[in-house]
Amino acid sequence: MLKKLNDAMDYIEAHLEDEFLLEKISEHINVSDYHFRKIFFALTNMTLNEYVKNRRLSEANKELLQGAQVTDVAYQYGYQSVDGFTRAFKKWSGILPSQVAKLKQCKSCQKLQFVVTMKGGTLMEYKIV
């Protein structure tokens, strides 16, 4: 399942600028949409929609820091209007998208990667017969 979760994160990254249905992610990794969303929320404490929105806004922030136009970035990351993008960006970052380049402020949401770390345990003696 760990590989499937990481495959899903790779799929999201590859399609951040595309219009895609979130159900396509679960199809891509061959897991039911319901179960994938439940597992994702249990591991991250955020919905899949929130994660995709945060990743898109994070990438948009990078573009704005490099001097890209707000209008271009809004449409590039799937927003239907500049007003909608501006509201979402301000709610997410606390500043207007038009202020990013001037203030040189960057808020980031990194790509998730799922790993298992095992610590502790009991040393077991074994004998091969």
Spans of model-derived segments:
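Residue-level signal for functionally critical sites in structured catalytic/ligand-binding pockets
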Residues: 13, 59, 82, 87, ...
